Amino acid sequence: MKKKKALPSLLYLVFIVLLPWGVSFSFNKCLELWIKNWWNTRQSETLLTDIQEKRILERFIELEELSLLDEMIKEKLKTHVQKPPIGIHKQIIQLVKIDNEDHLHIILHFSTNIICLAILSGSFFLSKKELVIFNSWVQEFFYNLNDSIKAFFILLVTDFFVGFHSTRGWELVIRWVYNDLGWAPNELIFTIFVCSFPVILDTCLKFWVFFCLNRLSPSLVVIYHSISEA
């Protein structure tokens, strides 16, 4: 009976792990060309939006091109030339292309993540039977362990997610999420998340240990506290 449950459960676990990666890779390739054509067609209607102009000016400042802009303005006042110098014109075109690539990156990743989430949710809904088998197999595997090993695994998981060094890991996670979604980094949100989320998670784990696990196996709770206080 255990072997019959183990094989489908392991296959289901592999499926759940590989599905998001496969969907993300496939739709990235499929949607990239379509979104690029749509965005370029849309952008051809206008030269520069206010947001693009602001970003381009900021990048000029970063590239220390203010002196070139001043020269262009002085030259325009003297000669009333309507077109900017060729070098500045090329730089503007290059910055517009970079700005468009940033927008494409955000739209592509956001669309891919929405589709991936929808497919993953649909797979959970359509595979309720496999999910029940997997859940029962995990519970059976965990309950068959002796209390010392159970306490070790619980302590390992809690220290991994809410331990002293876990804040660095959560910071990497939130930065990866922002990068994957194509959002601009926000240090304030990163700090708030790293300071608050591990505390909330630690409270939930303690509640589970004291109130839920204590009812199922009081001896396990005693061993857990003995190991954690050692």
Curated annotation (Swiss-Prot):
Question: Which biological process, per GO, is one annotated for this protein?
Answer: potassium ion transport
Quote the catalytic activity from the record. Answer: K(+)(in) + H(+)(out) = K(+)(out) + H(+)(in)
Q: State the compartments where it is located.
A: Plastid, Chloroplast inner membrane
The record describes its membrane topology as: Multi-pass membrane protein
Q: One GO MF term, please?
A: antiporter activity
Q: Name one Pfam family in it.
A: CemA
InterPro entries documented for this protein: CemA (IPR004282)
TM helices/strands, residue ranges? 7-27, 106-126, 145-165, 181-201
Classify the source by domain of life.
Answer: Eukaryota
- State what this protein does: Contributes to K(+)/H(+) antiport activity by supporting proton efflux to control proton extrusion and homeostasis in chloroplasts in a light-dependent manner to modulate photosynthesis. Prevents excessive induction of non-photochemical quenching (NPQ) under continuous-light conditions. Indirectly promotes efficient inorganic carbon uptake into chloroplasts.
Q: Which family does it belong to?
A: Belongs to the CemA family.
Give the protein's recorded name: Potassium/proton antiporter CemA
